[in-house]
Amino acid sequence: MAEPVIVVPRKGVYSDDSYHHHHRHHSFHSCTNFLLRTLTAGATAAAVVVMLISTQTSGTIYGYFRGRWRDYPAYKWLIIANAVVFVYSVMAAIVACFSVIARRGPLSYSPSAWLTLLVDFLAASALISAASAALAVALLARNGQDLQGTHYWPTVCNYVSKFCDYTQGAIIASFVGFGLLFLSTLLAASALYHLSHRRH
């Protein structure tokens, strides 16, 4: 009589330990992803709103002086970049919310995780470039610049301090949004790492 054959499931594929390990990592990625997306949407929305209401007009002995974002291409780019990232973050937050409920999401599969990593990287690059350009203009407006007596940029903030304070707040919010996007990129990379190890 032949001896019975006992099939032992390979560890990491069919075992309960593997399932709970994968489920634990998926829950962490999904919940953290939703939190980061929500915070990013809040930071970028704040930057856009603050920039849009930053216009200020003040009277001087030479007449009226107006500070507004429309007059600075760097500030226009800052608003556009934050608006684009805001829309993307809201859509990603909705998807992340459903992924928490369904226990399946973009970070559960390699192709979608790679796409998430790429889009996050591009969005973070656009946001940091806009924030850096706006920061250079803001510093110039606050401190002025004298290039060996040949060119002089006046300190605009002496006349429109509210405008400068608001733009500074928007720039800070933009850098916060960039930091959150950077963390989202790391999260996608972490998900890809665990997905690749789950195959072996």
Curated annotation (Swiss-Prot):
Keyword Membrane: yes
Main location: membrane
Topological domains, Cytoplasmic: 1-33, 99-120, 190-200
Sorted UniProt keywords: Cell membrane, Membrane, Transmembrane, Transmembrane helix
Membrane topology (Extracellular): 55-77, 142-168
Assembly information from the UniProt record: Homodimer and heterodimers.
Name the record gives this protein: CASP-like protein 1U2
